[in-house]
């Protein structure tokens, strides 16, 4: 398998969005929702060529008549048939490539079950006949994209958040922490607090509207209590949003109450530590000699870190947890929504990486378990 003459494909399969493209590019060619939609009603118009399932943007645009399902929950694939549909759509409709002609780099969340990664490997080789593949840890790729080899990555996507400390290019597995609280939980929480305002959003299609409200209007308050006071005493924080049917709704303190759950998971009835505390705990699990380097390189990555104000708040919270003399730096690259993909693009085009691929021959010889030996 000679990686020089053929471009590798990089696919970052997120719980919410799938990012796909070619190694060496600076941005993914295709970004679409990781959704498979099936009609809620039976078709009556014969000859319209109705399909029994829709993927990605097409599912999103027809959401009014479909039931939408996400095959990846909390970073783990829960429905392999739908996952196969998403990959098929990625190769043939989005990238328009033959998977049997390109090595494929896939990504996954750290601390995923081993079976998840084996099944990914099996489908790539047996269903799509790829010549070679590799599975990389998402947070590690984000660090590559930021041009660092040491730092702690706080990666928060739609399905899962995790903190991964990396020193001189090595991830420290004993200190990786995972938090099953991410964008989708915030969307559900936003649905709940909007219901308290008298706006009802219940179906899977309406959840997508709420996700849009969250992405466009939500932000993280630097001081939550003070912000609540401001919201109560004036209408300066209120914003309006036009629903697809033209109805206009107003949202106020929901704008910052929603992402506040990242710092106070008790809002969602969860007992876990918030993202700031999880980052701190992760640093504390590392050797005392390297903590300073980690505090000075806290890299945010993933779509759920895109809320305005999140970096300042993270800085404030970590400063109060860390030793008083510690220099803390939060790195929030503007392209952090795609930094996992960008890191994958960098990794797959390195000449030193070419011997890391799992080839079809190796797979045929050892079976799916080879992935644990060849990929971190």
UniProtKB/Swiss-Prot annotation:
Species, as recorded: Dictyostelium discoideum
Alphabetically ordered keywords of this record: ATP-binding, Cytoplasm, Cytoskeleton, Hydrolase, Nucleotide-binding
Entry protein name: Putative actin-22
Chief location bin: cytoplasm
Function field: Actins are highly conserved proteins that are involved in various types of cell motility and are ubiquitously expressed in all eukaryotic cells. Multiple isoforms are involved in various cellular functions such as cytoskeleton structure, cell mobility, chromosome movement and muscle contraction.
PROSITE patterns with a match to the protein in the record: ACTINS_1, ACTINS_2, ACTINS_ACT_LIKE
Reactions this protein catalyses: ATP + H2O = ADP + phosphate + H(+)
Signal peptide limits: none
Enzyme class: hydrolase
Example GO molecular function: myosin binding
Any single Pfam family the record assigns to this protein: Actin
